[in-house]
Curated annotation (Swiss-Prot):
<feature type="active site" description="Nucleophile">
    <location>
        <position position="11"/>
    </location>
</feature>
<dbReference type="InterPro" id="IPR050582">
    <property type="entry name" value="HAD-like_SerB"/>
</dbReference>
<dbReference type="GO" id="GO:0036424">
    <property type="term" value="F:L-phosphoserine phosphatase activity"/>
</dbReference>
<feature type="binding site">
    <location>
        <begin position="99"/>
        <end position="100"/>
    </location>
    <ligand>
        <name>substrate</name>
    </ligand>
</feature>
<keyword id="KW-0028">Amino-acid biosynthesis</keyword>
<protein>
    <recommendedName>
        <fullName>Phosphoserine phosphatase</fullName>
        <ecNumber>3.1.3.3</ecNumber>
    </recommendedName>
</protein>
<dbReference type="GO" id="GO:0005737">
    <property type="term" value="C:cytoplasm"/>
</dbReference>
<dbReference type="GO" id="GO:0000287">
    <property type="term" value="F:magnesium ion binding"/>
</dbReference>
<keyword id="KW-0718">Serine biosynthesis</keyword>
<feature type="binding site">
    <location>
        <position position="170"/>
    </location>
    <ligand>
        <name>substrate</name>
    </ligand>
</feature>
<dbReference type="Pfam" id="PF00702">
    <property type="entry name" value="Hydrolase"/>
</dbReference>
<dbReference type="GO" id="GO:0006564">
    <property type="term" value="P:L-serine biosynthetic process"/>
</dbReference>
<keyword id="KW-0378">Hydrolase</keyword>
<feature type="binding site">
    <location>
        <position position="13"/>
    </location>
    <ligand>
        <name>Mg(2+)</name>
    </ligand>
</feature>
<feature type="binding site">
    <location>
        <position position="11"/>
    </location>
    <ligand>
        <name>Mg(2+)</name>
    </ligand>
</feature>
<feature type="active site" description="Proton donor">
    <location>
        <position position="13"/>
    </location>
</feature>
<feature type="binding site">
    <location>
        <position position="20"/>
    </location>
    <ligand>
        <name>substrate</name>
    </ligand>
</feature>
Length: 211
């Protein structure tokens, strides 16, 4: 019998990878503390995601692209990520990542882990430097939920056969749409909306709960 096709959508920063991409880039720009403070408020749901992202990216203005690339080299997949994705694919899952962060980091991990889809925002670069602007389809509050629906539609998968894995407030919209909602080392605001909360920082833990 053919396996039923299902979909799993991962958040990127602090879920599929150990880092917060923007915090790593901010370290290169010497504005790490300011940016971290805004990231924390956004993940706790105290700030609108798009406003907070634009505010953080504006602090990166004039950073050379080489410094961005240096920061991205520090981004590492979460413990167990490679095994987990391999096993999910064996179980018939389409595996996707969606990030309010940046394609320059997300696409590297997509290739490394062999993901089927990756959605992220873009840092605008001019003359080899960041302009302090950002564009993309993961800026709005409900963007992740819309992307989950979009992939499910393309792949012909029912929403009840979808899983969302995330850690912060901007993952709420995909939790609202997904059949199974897994909070991974998450903030309290997301745990409230989850079916399952995992506290151990090892992605293999999710396999216990996924058919």
């Amino acid at each position: 019998m053919e396996k039923k096709k299902k979909l799993i959508l991962f958040d990127f920063d602090s879920t599929l990878v150990n880092n917060e991409t923007i915090d790593e880039i901010a370290r290169e720009a010497g504005v790490e503390e300011e940016v971290k403070k805004i990231t924390k408020e956004a993940m706790e749901g105290k700030l609108n995601f798009e406003q907070s992202l634009r505010k953080r990216v504006s602090l990166l203005k004039d950073l050379p692209i080489e410094k961005v690339e240096k920061a991205i080299k520090r981004i590492t997949p979460t413990e167990g990520a490679e095994e987990t994705i391999k096993e999910l694919k064996n179980r018939g899952y389409v595996v996707a990542v969606v990030s309010g962060g940046f394609d320059i980091a997300v696409n590297k991990i997509k290739e490394k882990l062999g993901l089927d889809y990756a959605f992220a925002n873009r840092l605008i670069v001019k003359d080899g430097k960041l302009t302090g602007d950002v564009e993309g389809e993961v800026l709005k509050e409900n963007a992740k939920g819309e992307i989950l629906e979009k992939i499910a539609k393309i792949e012909g998968i029912n929403l009840e056969d979808t899983v969302a894995v995330g850690d912060g407030a901007n993952d709420i919209s995909m939790f609202k749409k997904a059949g199974l909602k897994i909070a991974f080392c998450a903030k309290p605001i997301l745990k409230e909306k989850a079916d399952i909360c995992i506290e151990k920082r090892d992605l293999r833990e999710i396999l216990k709960y996924i058919k």
